[in-house]
Amino acid sequence: MKLTPEQQAMLNGEKGETMAKVVKTLVMYGDAFGAERMVPVTSKYGHTVISFGLKAIKPVYELYDQLIDAGLTSAQKFTADPRPIDDNIPTSLLEDIVFKKIMYTHQASYEEQLKKLGIKGEDDYSCTCYMDEVGNKPAKGEVLSWAESSAVVYANSVLGARCNRNSGIIELMGSVAGFVPEFGLLTDEGRKATWIIEVKCEKKPEAQLLGSAIGMKVMEEVPYIKGLDKWLGTELTDGVCAYLKDFGAATASNGSVGLYHIENLTPEAKEHGEALIKEGAQVYVIDDAELERVKASYPIIWKNKDAKPELCFVGCPHMSVQQLKDWTDAIEEKLRANGLSKVTVPTVFTAAPAVIKALKGTVYLDKLATYVLPSRRPSGLR
């Protein structure tokens, strides 16, 4: 690892022992992946994946206290993943005891730590920090220090930013130091595709199912996807971005994809085309039958396979304003067609606080509260 004089001075302790430990951690991280140098974090905001005050992660709180005591707030403001608890969602006494008295006993104190470290705002908790309403949308080519896998793959693929699939804590250290080791998806070579995906479906593939199929096949490698522009077009409209949000999250969670290219659609694919494909790339053909095979491969994990669902959650990653409107319209249509006034399974739609605020003053927020969930407060959202 070749450090700049300033970085070497930080490692030597000129900015304090705690900062030296931060830099040493980043150096060790880079060494593990063959990085030769550090590069500056250039995005306006960071993002942290750890947003939950679990009792079991005491070492995290101790580490963050060391940063705070040393005056090492983040060099950039940051957003965070969703809070684990929302009072809008009805819970039983037992659930309240488990969630608030046993599991998330450090939530309030942890959020105080995040404030001291530099969280962007009181309600900036969302896995879709890149949405316009949340305001953490990096530009093409910017270097990030993020860990949330669905946000990383979206930023890399749809926005053209550059970010590795970092771990929690490491991502905050990159924001504190202001630089990260250069390897993998931060490099031109690391962003080239080693898989060609040929989509040959007769109907628009379901985003989550297509993403799952690709993720399980390519794992952590980079796919170049052909044929999907037939269904999505060549422009990144709000609807297309919502599709890619869900698609990318599935590639990242069912595999470990941090970047994908879609021919004629995503920015780097538009700019470079098939020059992004490495020689000897493997080919995976996906048709309707293949998607059905993948869907059928998922096991039913309920102990009682005939049990009636008690609660449904929709929105991981968090939903967009347009998705919430579309779901509301679809539910309203189906309820009317079936002579019902409310869905038979209580349902929670999850979205960023800023997205929910954007729905206020429209008919959609009240409709969702009426149709989907008997909540404590007038909202079927969290």
Where are these regions (language model features)?
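Non-transmembrane, aqueous-exposed alpha-helical and coiled segments at domain scale
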Residues: M1-R382
